[in-house]
Amino acid sequence: MIDADGNLVCPPIADPHVHLDAVLVAGLLTRKNQTGTLLEAIDIWGEWREHLTKDLLKTNARKVIDWYIANGVLRVRTHADCTDPTLLTVESLLELKEEVKDLIDLQVVAFPQNGIFTDPMNEKLLRKAIDMGVDAVGGAPHIEYTREDGVKDVELVYDLAEKYDRLVDIHIDETGDPHSRFVEVMAKESINRGMGERSAASHTTAMHNYDNDYAYKLIGNIAKAKMNMIANPFDNAVLQNRRDGYPRRRGITRVDEMSERGINVCIGHDSIMDPWYSMGKGSMLQAAFLLLHMGQLNGASQIQQLFDMITTNSAKTMCLSDYGIKEGNSADLIIYDAQTEEDVIRLQSECTHVIRKGRVICKTQPAKRDLLYSENKWVDFKL
């Protein structure tokens, strides 16, 4: 018996977008990301990938999974770079998925980091990754050499996902370039194939810089397609629009406008101590807190929406059927050291209990701050 003492009990947190193949390598890199840009990070990763071993990858990923569990995150979707000829990352993460299944539910996306049509081998590697058993097919159309190849990138992802009955999760328009408009192709494919609810568009940071008339039309098509949208505030806040000078545009997609149109928007952590982002500890509450500020989402109803973006919205994006506190579902839940969703985000509350399949797998004693200048007085920042 656990006494929650009036505190918030909710389903586990879900992270729909992370790269477990790259976590925790920031301190091992011989070359640092001096410009802080997405493109330099991709170059650094390409150099580092040649030195990556299965043991190191799985050791780092397991450590981050421990962090996730301590933060109440029990559903995770990871991308696996499938442009490495060895497919080491795909093989390692599929093995890890099986090894940690009693602790956490893991989905693996075949992600062509360097594009599909930038190298003759990349399409073959993507197809092989699908044969290996990944859960979703990914793409990166904005990385391709031309607009035409970018369109082909999206179309091939849908062809493969439809043929092999996989989910779709595409890194798309992850740039400040307002001319990068591949999510419109994704919306079209989702509508024509009826695959929107099984599709996720990750990043879409170029939407921030679109002409408003075009963005309004696009958001309508995304809503019609019933697509899922993933914002990644940690990386996008620091990687995008770095050449702007001042005033500097925010690198966050149009979360508020899409939410107002009823589109399912959720939040991903994306990177944890890697070439793209050297910070992070697997806390989705931190990601929600940052998006609250970067996306100007501090309205009363928006704060509740933020909590949904790391729970139910993320679960919907991941197409999870066994999610939520209801009869018949797996007994997975967490208890926070706060009574409301707003206070959980404000306080960045600890999970006092993390429960997996009816078993407590993590307990945390929240910090208590004793004020030594006054007898029997302490602070917990609660009202």
What are these model-derived regions, one by one?
Residues M1-C10:
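Histidine-rich, glycine-flanked metal-binding segment
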Residues P11-V23, L167-G176:
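Histidine-centered catalytic micro-motifs
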Residues L24-L57, G133-A136, F182-A200, A223-N228, ...:
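Active-site gating loops and adjacent loop-to-helix segments of metal-dependent hydrolytic enzymes
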Residues A26-H79, L87-E99, L125-D131:
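Alpha-helical scaffold segments that flank or form the walls of functional sites
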Residues D43-N60, V109-P120, P141-E148:
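Active-site mouth loops of central-metabolism enzymes
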Residues L88-D102, D119-N228, G245-I267, Y323:
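Histidine/acidic residue-rich metal-binding segments in metalloenzymes
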Residues L167, K188-S199, D235-L239, R249-Y336:
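His/Asp/Glu-enriched, well-ordered alpha-helical/loop segment
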Residues Q304-L383:
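Active-site microenvironment of metallo-dependent hydrolases
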